[in-house]
Amino acid sequence: MNLSLNQLAILTIIAALPLMLLPELPSRSTILALAALAIVCTVVPLRNITLLALVVLMLCWMLWSARGALWQVETYSQNILPARVVVDRVTPDGKRAQIRLLTVHERWVFPPVHASVALPKQDHVYCAGQRWQMRLKLRPVHSQLNEGDFDQQRYALANHHILQGQVMSASVIDEKCSIRSQFLTNTQSVYQHLPWSGVLTALAFGERGELSAELSKLFRETGTAHLMAISGMHIGLAAGFGWILARGLQFLLPAKWIGHLFPLAITLLVAGLYTWLSGAHPPAQRAMLALLLWTAIRVSGKNWHGWHIWNLCIAALLLLDPLMILSESFWLSAFAVAALIAWYQWFPLPESLSQGIKSYPLKLLHLQAGMMILMLPVQAWVFSGLSLSALPANLMAIPVISLLTVPLILLALALPFSPIEEMLWWLADRSVAAVILCLRAFPSGWLAIEDALLMLICLPLAALIVWRFGWWRHAPLSLAGCCCALAIWRLTIPKPEWRVDMLDVGHGLAIVISKQGKAILYDTGNRWLNSNAGERIIIPWLERKGLQPEWIILSHGHLDHTGGLQAIQQRWPDISVRSALAHDRHFPCHAGESWQWYQLNFSVLWPRTSSTSGGNNDSCVVRIDDGRTAILLTGDIEREAELALLAAHRHQLRADILQVPHHGSSTSSVAPLLRAVAGKAALTSVARYNAWRMPSRQVIERYQQNGYAAYDTATEGQISVQITSNGWQVLGFRTHLLPRWYHQWFGVPRDSR
């Protein structure tokens, strides 16, 4: 059976899709057995069987690659490793580095193993390209997982950096920095004094670590963040720069030496150099591969359709690196190119409007409008929101960045040590300043998208497709049937009467009680050096769920429970706070307080009125019930407070679900308390790699002995309790809400206990 390259490409893309959806990977023996069966089936003289066998065979290659990534985790995350490494990248603050293991125990490592490590404090300056002998303590990346949150595990796998750890000791083998690192350092010294040097570094070298949080937020909210990541547009500009350079050189050559291959070769050379200078990040690599394929097609003299080239590029990328299918930036790039092809194929600008220089603004508007409409569903899915100012912001920023800033940077990179180098960098900096000045003038236009609206976001794209193919004329009944089926499916999704969600905030606590679109927060998570759980996790989660928080209950005053308070109050200034901290603006949270909220009964059982210090044993213990199901929230109380609580309110403690006190420490969860509560489920908020190795193994066993099903956020991610009139159920993110092989607990089972 003869198959075209386009057909093989489509089969490859189909074969890669299950890698996104599988809850777990088959064993290596199963993969080999499937591959052997597929090879046998390829000789069957039936077209459909042969096609299926080819898909299975390519799927086996994808699964084998994924298995290989997990094998690296299992092999290199158990003991301290003596390794020879090369430094790939160092963070601007010099505290962390990405390394590549060359040898382990004097054995060469293949395929390469990458890790992100904390560097030891010493006088030596690290830089990319250096070779070191290190003793490494590595462990798998373990992500905090919540609905709509950044998926660090998936990101780490897609970028082949699933190991992290620390350097126990290090001795230098070769301290010479790489040519790129030396060039970067020398070049930065020329423009480092300029106001927007961080943006220049991002555009020239692909290093975005110097961009401030405020600037990153500005680019995200105006929909211009893609301009700061070196990708197809930037590599294309470099290729165009190379083509112009080559054509200029050809004016100096004899006519017999002038041909079409020379400009193509220089185009590839310049684009390749820029890809290398930019650090060869995945988006730049993808663009370079696409350029190579396009060049090969041009040289071959074949006339391929845009969709065929797209299929071939996507298939080639997935064959070379199957885990790329887990990358959100890959999907954004792929859909962006597909949107361009579809827009110009389906909705071309009329010829009467596309003639002459005056038509360029209209062409740009046509392009941006098409990208905005067609990319709407993908952007909403990836970013959980949309920028309302993206169209005008991009209409302003893209011409300046693409026609002025990047060409100036390319000229400056091509003319190092020349008299005009510093002037070129200054001009590039001024162009960036103008763009940022205009972006800051736009009103805040970021719109968080609720889960319930994600389907509606797809309607403009669906309407365009229906109109373009004339389905509303040719198949109105089928179209109406599909719409009715979708509406019925959406309306019949079972909804709980109320729910309780323990968010995965690492070491800390944040619980959301929600009903009828309103919410109460019990604690607000931790605060870290540059962010907090409120800003990073809780606020985006509430916005995605379409919830309006009305109250915050602070269990006590420790930072891992109050870290996100300020950010949440800034987002919702009218929110009320209840605590036992004797704060002037806080409502009291002491034993004896009770109230109703949307037919839910809240009763405070602890602490005593005199307790205001905000320590663990002064935690505000709250019982919530609807008359059928009860939940007991205990904060961080320990043995002393637990026994006092038992003595004072033994008969009021009964509940179905218990929030495990003090993250499951060995100083809490006494057996009499567990028997008095007589619950069925125990929920613990804890980080996998916490310094205290919580929850304690003895405490977990104590819960199990008393009939509780034990859940913790380190294992499950977000834990959701959905309550209906018929009962309740506990759903973990990793095991129920989104069970995927790349969400699982990698490495030694429960190795932080």
Language model segments and positions:
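N-terminal leader/targeting segments
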Residues: M1-E74, Q164-V167, I179, R286, ...
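Membrane-interface helix/helix-cap signal primarily in integral membrane proteins
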Residues: N2, M58-H226, N532, R536-P540, ...
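Membrane-interface micro-motifs in multi-pass membrane enzymes
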Residues: S4-L5, L22-S29, M228-G236, L277-L291, ...
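Alpha-helical transmembrane segments
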Residues: S4-P18, T267-L269, N311-A315, G370
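Internal transmembrane alpha-helical bundles of multi-pass membrane proteins
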Residues: I13, A280-P460, W472, L645-L658, ...
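Structural signal for the C-terminal ends of transmembrane alpha-helices
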Residues: L22, I39-N48, W64-A66, L245-L252, ...
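Non-globular, low-confidence helical/coil segments that flank catalytic cores
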Residues: Q122-R135, H161, S352-K358, L413-R753
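Aromatic-rich juxtamembrane segments at the membrane interface
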Residues: A158-A290, A296, W595, F602, ...
